[in-house]
């Protein structure tokens, strides 16, 4: 079961990192954010991650799609609040 707390926690963390990522001009900072989010995705509610990812195993872990994925995740979580 996905709890309201897990949604709020994920939203807060991902939203904050997404805002920084989108406006950052520093490659090392973007890389650090990608690593932090991938680690968070590994540890977050699997049910919540599955709902956001539509079954994609590399969701929030693919460097080439990261900005698209984190933006989508924030939108999904916002709608779940």
Labelled PLM ranges:
Residues 14-21, 40, 47, 77:
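Non-transmembrane amphipathic alpha-helical segments
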Residues 2-32:
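N-terminal acidic leader/helix
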Residues 23-70:
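Acidic, low-complexity, intrinsically disordered interaction modules
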Residues 1-5, 56, 75-81:
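Short intrinsically disordered terminal tails
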């Amino acid at each position: 079961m996905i709890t309201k707390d897990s949604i709020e926690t994920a939203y807060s963390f991902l939203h904050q990192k997404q805002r920084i990522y989108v406006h950052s001009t520093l490659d090392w900072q973007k890389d650090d954010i990608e690593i932090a989010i991938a680690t968070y995705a590994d540890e977050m509610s699997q049910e919540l991650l599955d709902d956001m990812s539509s079954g994609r195993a590399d969701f929030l872990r693919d460097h080439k799609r990261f900005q698209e994925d984190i933006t989508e995740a924030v939108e999904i979580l916002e709608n779940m609040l």
